[in-house]
Amino acid sequence: LYLPKEAQYEYLLNLPEDISVAGLKDKDDNDMKSLGEVVNNAMSLIEEQSEQLTGVLPNSYTDFSDEILSELLRIFNNSALDEVGGDVIGRIYEYFLNKFAKNIASDDGVFFTPKSLVKMIVNIIEPERGILLDPACGSGGMFIQSGDFVNAMGMNANSAMTFYGQEKVEYNAQLCLMNMAVHGLTGVIKSGDEANSFYHDAHNLEGKCNYVMANPPFNVDKVKAETAANAGRLPFGMPKENKNKEIGNANYLWISYFYAYLNETGRAGFVMASSATDSQGSDKDIREKLVKTGHVDVMISVGNNFFYTKSLPCSLWFFDKGKKEELKDKVLFIDARNYYTVVDRTLNEWTEWQLKNLNAIVWLYRGEKDKYTALLQEYRKVLGQAIPFEEALHLLKSEL
């Protein structure tokens, strides 16, 4: 991405303290009298260089005083950021998304999926090449983690993968596009009414996706039944409509969509309300048809308090249309409701080692013993580097 001089960090950092007397002009040749106007102009210049970011970057920096903006520029003028290298800015962006989600005590926080759940989905799906769709993409966590996974294998995620997303809330879609940009990823994200997955297949991807990953909103009601039916992607039929000709709970619409988007060897992984595993009526009928396909692969029960805005438990579902023949009549169930690490009073997560342990169960189920053996070797290496208890105690006493 080419950045004009006026959009470069060094230029902004070295501006005079009093912008009003600097005689600066924006890209449209208007006078700029505040640092906020200068930063807004920088955002506009960046958008001109990137079709993906057009209309996405914030343009309200004039809401902040010059003193606050100057201090922020100074804080990020830190040689430590350059020395660390790698995807530092991307990780900083993720950190603030995380903090933002924690401070939203409502369903508005559904734009953010906890990282340990995203990692679990990506680790089991193991994306390599092809089309990845998230039809409820929020801030894009599935794309970021998938990109990291592919890059870690020595490939270039932008060359190997094509990322597509739908997100009804335009603000969340902007978060997603910025998140992808700072992580060096490109993708096609649709937002607004045309991206309402209940009524639109915005990218025309039914039957074409190698991978589908999502954390859809749970238990959505008042979905217009006729409009949803006309939008298709319902290989197992429609959930029952109520007297108002609405779908009272859309969980099985989502589940049907995730299956319908897959190609003949595609894999899907998604978060779902725990209640969907045993809901009755038309949901049960759809679930029975789904199981009979032989493509349900893994189900993981997750405990309470994994979300910032919800305390209820959830489940992770996985489909695999390319399952080995000997696994076609099998589904792996993992009860991980009591397996977690407490972060604080209201939040739990899976640590890296807990993720590896859960992943190991899936490998053994699939007969991938080489991956399991490699993990054992990793365990042995880490344990071999551990400091003996007596030595650790001595070090602790010396520090005290």
Question: For the regions a protein language model found, what residue spans apply to each?
Answer:
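Non-catalytic, mostly N-terminal accessory regions of nucleic-acid modification and defense proteins
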Residues: L1-E128, V188-H203, S301-N304, L327-A336, ...
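Conserved S-adenosyl-L-methionine
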Residues: D107-A214, N219-N230, G237-E241, Y252-L253, ...
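Short amphipathic alpha-helical segments, especially helix-boundary/capping motifs
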Residues: I46-S50, D66-E71, Y93-N98, V150-M155, ...
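A conserved structural/catalytic subdomain of Rossmann-like adenosyl-cofactor enzymes
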Residues: E206-L400
